[in-house]
């Protein structure tokens, strides 16, 4: 137990140092920043991965951020297993550091989504449940809605259609008062996906009602 606590202490001290280093890199317009990687990862994914390897070697960014960005790059390359692996690493690092709850929530959402893409629906739902707890603790209704909708999609793919539509409706209700661009885009997307499922199930009148709401 003492060894475990000592390791955690060293990890926390290391994180403090890396946070200061990351701030300095940002101020110097370094390529080893989240913004720079985000700007190039779609057009230059291999270069983005190389820069992340260099950032890790130079200790220029927090490990959880590096693995988060690696996951993002691999997801864009449609390599979801690798994306999940690195998202999981970031999630574990955030859990140990226990000082960036927003990023931990972000990685929990990513893991739920990636597990669903990999058809690991039960795994996805476990992350959904954990993410909803985190989102409620932070009063983040948009994150909660995103997680609920992911659970609804999982239920739909597992053929629990009635439960899926109920979960979709719960997610949509959480966004019903959204007044920001991101929330409104998410609401529109959720309604569109629900409409597609209703049409697939030959529930045309229900689909039209959702379309009018949208």
Which sequence ranges carry the predicted segments?
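A "functional boundary" signal
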Residues: 19-214
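Hydrophobic membrane-targeting alpha-helices
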Residues: 12-20
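Sec-dependent N-terminal signal peptides
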Residues: 4-13
């Amino acid at each position: 137990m003492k060894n475990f606590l000592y390791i955690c202490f060293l990890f926390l001290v290391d994180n403090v140092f890396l946070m200061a280093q990351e701030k300095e890199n940002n101020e110097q317009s370094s390529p080893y920043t989240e913004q720079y990687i985000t700007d190039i990862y779609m057009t230059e994914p291999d270069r983005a991965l190389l820069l992340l390897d260099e950032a890790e070697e130079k200790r220029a960014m927090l490990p959880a951020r590096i693995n988060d960005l690696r996951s993002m790059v691999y997801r864009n390359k449609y390599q979801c297993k690798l994306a999940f692996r690195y998202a999981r690493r970031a999630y574990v690092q955030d859990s140990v550091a226990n000082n960036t709850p927003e990023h931990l929530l972000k990685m929990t959402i990513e893991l739920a989504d990636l597990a669903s893409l990999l058809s690991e629906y039960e795994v996805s739902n476990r992350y959904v449940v954990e993410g909803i707890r985190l989102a409620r603790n932070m009063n983040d209704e948009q994150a909660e809605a995103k997680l609920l909708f992911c659970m609804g999609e999982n239920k739909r793919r597992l053929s629990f259609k009635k439960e899926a539509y109920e979960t979709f409706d719960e997610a949509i209700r959480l966004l019903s008062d959204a007044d920001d661009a991101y929330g409104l885009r998410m609401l529109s997307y959720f309604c569109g996906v629900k409409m597609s499922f209703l049409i697939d199930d030959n529930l045309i009148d229900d689909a039209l009602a959702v379309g009018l709401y949208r």
